Amino acid sequence: MPVRILKPRTPGTRFFSYPSFEEITTDKPEKSLLVPNKSTGGRNNNGRVTSRHMGGGHKRYYRIIDFKRNKDGIPAKVATIEYDPNRTARIALLSYADGEKRYILAPNGIKVGDLIECGPEADIKVGNALPLKNIPVGIEVHNIEMRPGKGGQMARSAGSYAVLVAKEGDYATLKMPSGELRKVRVECKATVGVIGNLEHENLSLGKAGRSRWLGIRPQTRGMAMNPVDHPMGGGEGKSKSGGGRKHPKSPWGQKSKGLKTRKRKKASSKLIVRRRDSKK
């Protein structure tokens, strides 16, 4: 998927780049797999902001995606490859031999007319989903389950994948996109291949308005606020912690910039062999 760059005829097109969409085969989604998607604006049921910097944006329908890939032994043909406004990856519409239609995350290299299947007996082929115990070591996988039968939860965004580095006993070891080494039960399913839309990370929105179209509101630095609005607000000049306080904090008073926020007693911590690589 090449990235297209416009000539800087206006300030909004000077830094703007967008995908070519050449892999998209239709602009009409499957109606039976669409559900309304009401925007919350970052508010909970009490009307209070629980997720900042959210609101506005274009209306969207949610596409029901098959993350479980549980139609074992039934072959399917790729009918279309479509754009999904709710995620960075493209989606593929599968038409199964029994007549059912389902959306899946479109792997890189998949084409209309390709045959795809899932289950323990499936071939090691891009787009096929099978348990980790049936996948050879060294294969790149995506849409990985954390618990058997729960559906894929890891490596689902554009261009992401994990590498199966080892299998020992009841667990398989995966190198995640973050660099983390993590154990997962060998009964968990994963899909072979890399998620498509690889050039997504090279795109530039070009102007603030395009960010608003996506439902993303502006972010204001805590240092630029007043003390009543943020723990890091106030002070004379650019005081890092605001008004002489010792450590930078989040808007709710939790220490930020260096503090580990993962729960110490989380059960799945024992499955992490090595923490993710630090971003330097």
Curated annotation (Swiss-Prot):
Statement: the UniProt record of this protein carries the keyword RNA-binding: yes
Cited Pfam families: Ribosomal_L2 (PF00181), Ribosomal_L2_C (PF03947)
Signal peptide segment: none
GO cellular component, one term: large ribosomal subunit
Compositionally biased spans, kind Polar residues: 37-49
Region (Disordered): 32-54, 221-280
An annotated Gene Ontology molecular function: structural constituent of ribosome
Composition bias type Gly residues, residue spans: 232-242
Superkingdom of the organism of origin: Bacteria
Keywords, alphabetical: Ribonucleoprotein, Ribosomal protein, RNA-binding, rRNA-binding
Basic residues bias spans: 257-280
A Gene Ontology biological process term: cytoplasmic translation
NCBIfam families in the record: rplB_bact
Protein family membership: Belongs to the universal ribosomal protein uL2 family.
HAMAP family with a match to the protein in the record: Ribosomal_uL2_B
Subunit structure comment from the entry: Part of the 50S ribosomal subunit. Forms a bridge to the 30S subunit in the 70S ribosome.
Protein role: One of the primary rRNA binding proteins. Required for association of the 30S and 50S subunits to form the 70S ribosome, for tRNA binding and peptide bond formation. It has been suggested to have peptidyltransferase activity; this is somewhat controversial. Makes several contacts with the 16S rRNA in the 70S ribosome.
Name this polypeptide is given: Large ribosomal subunit protein uL2
Species this protein is from: Chloroherpeton thalassium (strain ATCC 35110 / GB-78)
Origin organism lineage: Bacteria, Pseudomonadati, Chlorobiota, Chlorobiia, Chlorobiales
Name of the gene encoding the protein in the UniProt record: rplB
